């Protein structure tokens, strides 16, 4: 099956209050290779999942934008608000940041991944945490066997934040990230 033909194999939608996994009502998780996460959250896709497909099918269900901070109706110099507008109509202010903070929108984030891998990236998992304040994409790299039976996978973990707490990052890991706790490993 090609990435353009992927269809959701299963979808599990659960609403949560604040939990250690940091998956909230406006967050999304997509999982490729027909492998569900052990917690049962997210949308599982059969076959390969490209960054573009992960964006369209799950993570891209929102629009990020900047707006001025207002006090008594007047803009406050040096600050702006980062907000998200979700497909379900919800709107959420994610953070107040300084003017020097550059918003890397989700659509641009996924375009960069497509270019870095020349359109050949295979997304293992992708999602948002903390109502969209954090976003990740886990791209599968190499796989090998130790002692002929223990499979080891390596991934590129791409991270972006919309809360001003960090920047666009790349990490190498052998952990399949599916929520906050596995992101922390």
Regions found by a protein language model. Name each.
Residues 2-4, 10-112:
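Feature for intrinsically disordered/low-complexity regulatory segments and propeptides
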Residues 105-185:
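Intrinsic disorder/low-complexity polar-acidic segments
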